[in-house]
A protein has these predicted regions:
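N-terminal auxiliary segments of SAM/dcSAM-dependent transferases
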Residues: 1-60, 69-72
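A short acidic, Gly/Pro-enriched loop at the edge of an enzyme's catalytic core
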Residues: 93, 161-173
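Conserved class I S-adenosyl-L-methionine
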Residues: 94-104, 122
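Conserved SAM-binding loop of SAM-dependent methyltransferases across substrates and taxa
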Residues: 105-117
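Helix-to-beta-strand junctions that scaffold the AdoMet/dcAdoMet cofactor pocket
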Residues: 116, 182-183, 199-201
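A short glycine-rich, Lys/Arg-flanked "PGG" loop and its adjoining helix->strand segment in the class I
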Residues: 188-201
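Conserved beta-strand signature within the Rossmann-like core of class I S-adenosyl-L-methionine
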Residues: 202-209
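Core SAM-dependent methyltransferase catalytic element
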Residues: 222-224, 229-253
Length: 253
């Protein structure tokens, strides 16, 4: 009989941008197949100029497959390492009220909940399948159970542009790879302004994204935040990922 720990399923934090990953593999494998066919069977049957493209097909196909593998590594390994760095950058007491904007499968949410004793971690999302494979509140709750923090986690269906919370409700706001999914500039600004509204004076914000982080930082500075930094980029998902780390001024706005 297997030990109890080995029988308990590990938390599954999903594959980010599953359609993109699928397309990388489809294009890559197709290119490799075409290149192989041209190399093995094309000589004498097809024009030489066409056969000469076999190397390009194999090279391009291999690059797309590699990008798909990097995306999977980013989802399964890289983003968990980044999560740990982001969580470690927060000064925790244990009694914080935490909000995770666009929590998905709960990677940031659960990481924060593990740092809490009497506090509570609340995650909001609209659960879009194109953002993460099998994205649902049920999957997130299951992950919280597997990680032993279900009693410190709460989930709600909500749009980042209109958060259903009172002003100055949270000590810490987290977000990872979510706000770029709001495609218009005005909508992203609304989301950042909502984060500003619900965060307490002196509260901490840590936000990771693959695009628009300079816009987020500029909006925060325009709202009077003077402790705003952007970390150096990393390449978890091909496109550079940057983290915005900021603290809301203690003066009430």
């Amino acid at each position: 009989m297997k030990p109890l720990q080995s029988r308990i399923k590990r938390a599954d934090y999903g594959i980010d941008a599953p359609t993109v990953v699928r397309n990388f593999f489809l294009i890559g494998i197709s290119g490799c197949i075409v290149g192989t066919i041209l190399a093995k069977f094309g000589s004498g049957r097809l024009p030489n100029w066409l056969v000469s493209f076999y190397g390009a097909c194999l090279g391009i196909g291999g690059c797309f497959v590699l990008q798909g593998l990097i995306m999977i590594w980013g989802s399964k390994v890289g983003k968990q390492r980044l999560r740990d760095k982001m969580i470690d950058s927060v000064s925790w007491r244990g009694d914080e009220q935490v909000l995770d904007v666009g929590c998905g499968h709960g990677l940031m949410l659960i990481g924060a909940a593990k740092r809490l004793t009497t506090g509570q971690a609340l995650g909001i999302d609209i659960w879009q399948q194109e953002d993460q494979a099998s994205n649902s509140s049920r999957a997130t709750q299951e992950n919280a159970l597997r990680e032993g923090v279900a009693d410190r986690v709460e989930l709600r269906d909500s749009d980042a542009r209109q958060l259903p919370f009172l002003d100055e409700s949270f000590d810490v706001v987290l977000s990872s790879f979510a706000i770029h999914n709001i495609y218009d500039t005005v909508g992203r600004e609304k989301a950042i302004r909502e984060i500003h509204r619900v965060l307490k004076p002196g509260g901490q914000l840590v936000l990771a994204d693959i695009r628009h982080t300079s816009q987020y930082a500029d909006i925060l500075r325009s709202l009077g935040w003077n402790q705003v930094t952007r970390w150096l980029p990393n390449f978890l998902f091909i496109t550079p990922t940057r983290v915005v780390r900021a603290a809301k001024p203690n003066t009430r706005s």
